[in-house]
């Protein structure tokens, strides 16, 4: 990952094409389904770990910042629930899920932009993949359940 140009047709191919696609998106992107790197098969398996590259090429910097802001909102909701939770389990669970989402997002974005090696970390709730998506949805459901149980006990005691 430090020098993908050394093996541009082998191990560095995916990362080089990812950087080209991210850079070609510019500020506003090329438009929905108009990405040349993505749809001319220069970037293989774009729907999996490199979905952020596809978003960057088609929707540009504005689209990528919108996705990042949505993730920050979701992570901040997890931390807000941990602060408001009455039970220690709900607090620990919410902090853990929020931290896990934060690490996944940072690692995926760093991976597709060349700051970290490509290791196969999906972008939560966006990348194609069954087991990772299922695990993330279940963990968010547990956080929402912890928040709901805290509110139900408040209503019951009132």
Model-derived segments and their meaning:
Residues 1-64, 86-90:
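Hydrophobic, glycine- and aromatic-enriched re-entrant/interface helices and adjoining loop segments
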Residues 81-120:
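Loop-to-helix entry and N-terminal half of a specific, functionally important transmembrane alpha helix
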Residues 58-78, 93-94, 134:
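Hydrophobic alpha-helical transmembrane segments
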Residues 54-57, 97-101, 129-132:
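Transmembrane helix-bundle signature of multi-pass membrane transporters/permeases
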Residues 72-83, 143-150:
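Structural signal for the C-terminal ends of transmembrane alpha-helices
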Residues 29, 62-69, 101-110:
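Hydrophobic alpha-helical segments of membrane proteins
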Residues 108-158:
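A juxtamembrane structural motif centered on a specific transmembrane helix
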């Amino acid at each position: 990952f430090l020098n993908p140009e050394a093996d541009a047709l082998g191990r560095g191919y995916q990362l080089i094409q990812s950087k080209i696609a991210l850079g070609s998106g510019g500020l506003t992107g090329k438009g929905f389904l108009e990405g040349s790197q993505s749809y001319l098969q220069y970037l293989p398996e774009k729907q999996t770990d490199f979905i952020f590259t596809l978003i960057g090429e088609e929707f540009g910097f504005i689209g990528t910042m919108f996705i990042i802001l949505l993730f920050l909102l979701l992570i901040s909701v997890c931390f807000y629930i941990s602060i408001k939770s009455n039970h220690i389990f709900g607090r620990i669970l919410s902090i853990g899920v929020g931290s896990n989402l934060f690490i996944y997002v940072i690692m995926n974005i760093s991976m597709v932009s060349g700051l970290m090696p490509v290791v196969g970390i999906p972008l939560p709730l966006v990348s194609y993949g069954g087991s990772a998506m299922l695990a993330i949805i279940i963990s968010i459901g547990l956080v929402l359940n912890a928040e709901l149980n805290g509110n139900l006990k408040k209503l019951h005691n009132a």
